Swiss-Prot record:
InterPro entries in alphabetical order: YbaB-like_sf, YbaB/EbfC
Purpose: Binds to DNA and alters its conformation. May be involved in regulation of gene expression, nucleoid organization and DNA protection.
Compartments it resides in: Cytoplasm, Nucleoid
Alphabetized UniProt keyword annotations: Cytoplasm, DNA-binding
Organism: Persephonella marina (strain DSM 14350 / EX-H1)
Keyword DNA-binding attached: yes
Keyword Glycoprotein: no
Oligomeric and partner information: Homodimer.
Molecular function (Gene Ontology), one example: DNA binding
Pfam entry (one): YbaB_DNA_bd
Protein family (similarity comment): Belongs to the YbaB/EbfC family.
Protein name (database record): Nucleoid-associated protein PERMA_0533
This protein's GO CC annotations: bacterial nucleoid; cytosol
Length: 110
């Protein structure tokens, strides 16, 4: 039969988990991730939620001759920033939800 006492405990656990996740989001918002490509010629700075804060480009890339190189470096930087953000966010949210971190692919859910 259905036990209402267990339901109450589950609701408390869910509320606690939700509070932990909100706290983790605030921590991620404050966290800074720096991605450098091209030997530091392009740098992307973002927070743990993936919000881009700054893009720094070496002035030597800002010429017509370097147009394609700059495009390639920007693509590489944004792809790496995306990968790193997912990694950091997955770890933080898995921890906040109280889930084991050794389950493959679990971090990709967040």
């Amino acid at each position: 039969m259905f036990n209402l006492g267990n339901l109450g405990e589950m609701m408390k656990m869910m509320k606690s988990m939700q509070e932990n996740i909100e706290k983790a989001k605030e921590e991620l918002r404050k966290e800074e991730i720096v991605v450098e490509v091209g030997g530091g010629m392009v740098k992307v700075i973002l927070n743990g939620l993936g919000e881009i804060k700054d893009v720094l480009i070496d002035k030597t890339l800002l010429t017509e001759d370097n147009h394609e190189i700059l495009q390639d470096l920007l693509v590489a930087a944004f792809n790496e920033a995306n990968r790193r953000t997912k990694e950091v966010m997955g770890e933080k949210m898995t921890q906040a939800a109280g889930l084991p971190s050794n389950i493959p692919g679990l971090g990709n859910l967040f």
